UniProtKB/Swiss-Prot annotation:
Disulfide bridge map: none
A Pfam family matched in the record: HK
Cofactor: Mg(2+)
Biological-process GO terms, alphabetical: thiamine biosynthetic process; thiamine diphosphate biosynthetic process
Protein name: Hydroxyethylthiazole kinase
Catalytic activity field: 5-(2-hydroxyethyl)-4-methylthiazole + ATP = 4-methyl-5-(2-phosphooxyethyl)-thiazole + ADP + H(+)
Function: Catalyzes the phosphorylation of the hydroxyl group of 4-methyl-5-beta-hydroxyethylthiazole (THZ).
Amino acid sequence: MQPDLHCRTLAAHTLKHFRALSPLTHCMTNDVVQTFTANTLLALGASPAMVIDPVEARPFAAIANALLVNVGTLTASRADAMRAAVESAYDAKTPWTLDPVAVGALEFRRRFCLDLLSLRPAAIRGNASEILALSGMALGGRGVDTTEAALAALPAAQALAHQIDCIVVVTGEIDYVTNGQRTLSIPGGDPLMTRIVGTGCALSAVVAASCALPGAALDNVASACCWMKLAGQAAAERSEGPGSFIPAFLDALYHLDVEAANEEN
């Protein structure tokens, strides 16, 4: 099936709901991106919480609006905490999102991520290599970098979405968002987004938060991708390199006006 281009008018409408709701988003993410992830959510209007201790993670996941599990700096004790949080979210019907960082490169995290799939994530966000590995169609990938184009992983994403009954996002130069039956494409962004640590991980947090919104999950998640792409483009226009890009990106998220960007394009 051919992907449809996501509608920016819908993304603008979804952003208004996102800012009004300010989803409380429980982020169990990796150590490298904690601050950037929290600031990204705050800039867009969400409420981040970085609760990681197993004793606290289980009850907190039940009261949050959404949960993110990012396995970038996975340890055995952190896996226990994540598993407890996901089980709690599952029982409470809290939508949770999996970011399977480098899942094809390391066996411990691969087995952990595959085990979590039985607890029905609302969304999975990864690059092409990660989605191919998680679907069982390929193993490998060099850490968080992708060795495949997003389009090459689209059949794997569609199959995984159909199998798990969730939304799968494959990110790249063009992002693809699918529920297994319908697929949306989101172009845009800027190469500078790949020259700093954490844009993909932060997107996963925004995807998680968007899953807390009412309405069609596919459209909400595609809107999240659109917001990040537009902010990346705007930030790149006023940046000289990676160092100035980060604050410009956060400012662009804070001031994001999807309707105005739509008129400019």
